[in-house]
Regions:
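Generic detector of leucine side chains in alpha-helical contexts
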Residues: 1, 53, 60, 77, ...
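Class I SAM-dependent methyltransferase SAM-binding "motif I" and its flanking Rossmann-like core
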Residues: 121-178
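Extended, subdomain-level signal for the structured scaffold at the beginning of enzyme domains
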Residues: 8-119
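Sec/Tat signal peptide C-region and signal peptidase I cleavage site
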Residues: 3-7
Length: 178
């Protein structure tokens, strides 16, 4: 193989899985809304609400690790939606990728899946992805998050980056525990 053929086969720094229409919805009116869901069982009505707010456009799940397991679940809850996609963004390189940013900018709803919030902090902070997400929130598209995905939607994030974590007793005794 030539050098250009090898370069053409280079794996992208992200993973992308899409079901439903392969063509992006356009000219969709969205309504601002936020769902902050703790860990545990997903709440069907919360996802249905986000789909309604999205104008049945393109629903995007983002995460740093994991699978596309949300895709069929959300498509079943929101059968009139244009598409459901999962974008796995596991590095700073992926968080600065043109395709990732274009996909964020084309979504009518964004959901941040649960996982390890320190991955979100390490991989996404101060990247083009971070800026694009803030822009989309300001533009008023519906957003949501589960567990760690909820955590990174807030102003302050506990990520356990500096130590192995904190117990409830330690946090109650000293909320500024480092």
């Amino acid at each position: 193989l030539s050098g250009s053929a090898i370069a053409a086969k280079k794996k992208p720094p992200y993973e992308y899985f899409r079901i439903g229409s392969q063509t992006d919805a356009s000219n969709i009116q969205t309504t601002r809304g936020t769902v902050m869901m703790g860990g545990g069982i997903d709440v069907d009505d919360a996802f249905k609400w986000i789909c309604t707010l999205s104008g049945d456009g393109d629903f995007l799940i983002i995460r740093a690790a994991g699978t596309d397991a949300y895709n069929p679940y959300i498509q079943q809850l929101c059968p009139n939606g244009n598409s459901v996609a999962t974008l796995i963004i596991p590095s700073v390189n992926a968080a600065n990728d043109e395709f990732v940013i274009a996909t964020i900018n084309a979504a009518e709803a964004i959901w941040i899946a649960g996982g390890d919030q320190s991955n979100y902090v390490n991989f996404w902070t101060n990247t083009l992805l971070h800026s694009a997400l803030k822009d989309r929130i300001e533009q008023g598209i519906p957003f949501g998050g589960t567990s760690a995905g909820l955590d990174v939607l807030t102003q302050f994030i506990y990520s356990a980056l500096l130590n192995k974590g904190v117990t409830s007793a330690q946090a109650l005794k000293d909320p500024f525990n480092k």
